[in-house]
Amino acid sequence: SIWATGTGPSFAGDLSRFESLPQNTVAMTFGDVVDCPPPDQFGILSGDDLMVRMASELNTTHAIFLLGDTEGLLDRPPDQPGAELITLWTPEQKIAGKHDSALDVTGGIFLKIASASAISKHVENVWLIDGRQPQRVLQLIRTGKTRGTRVIG
C-alpha cells in the first residue's frame, strides 16, 4: 500500500481519503502488504487494525466484519461439533478458539473480536456477519438487525 506504513492499530497513514466519500457510501477495506520501518522491510497491515483507526478517526456509523466461514462469532471453532452462534457478544464472554499463525499472520478471530470491542467504544453498530451472505450487510444497514453477532464494548 502506498498510503500506509507499519502494522498494528497505530500504523502510519492518512485516513483523510475516506472522509471525502459521498454520503451513504459503504467503504470496504481489507488488509494489505505495507512497507515497515527498519529492520523489517514489509509487513501485513490487518484490515482489523485499519477498521480500529477508521472507527476512532472518522464519522463511522457501522463497522461490519465479514467472515468467510461462519454466520458470526461462535462459542467454539466452526469445525467443532455443537458450535453455536453468539448473537450478542461482550468482552467478558470467553470463547474457545484456536489461531494458526502459519495460515493467518494478522491475529485471526482473537484480533477480530479485540478490534470489534475497541471499535464498539466509538461506533454503536459493530457486527460480525457471514460474508457469504452479502444481503445481510444491506439488511443490517437498512433495519439495524440481521443474523450474526453484535459486539457491545
Language-model features: locations:
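C-terminal catalytic "cap/lid" subdomain
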Residues: 1-153
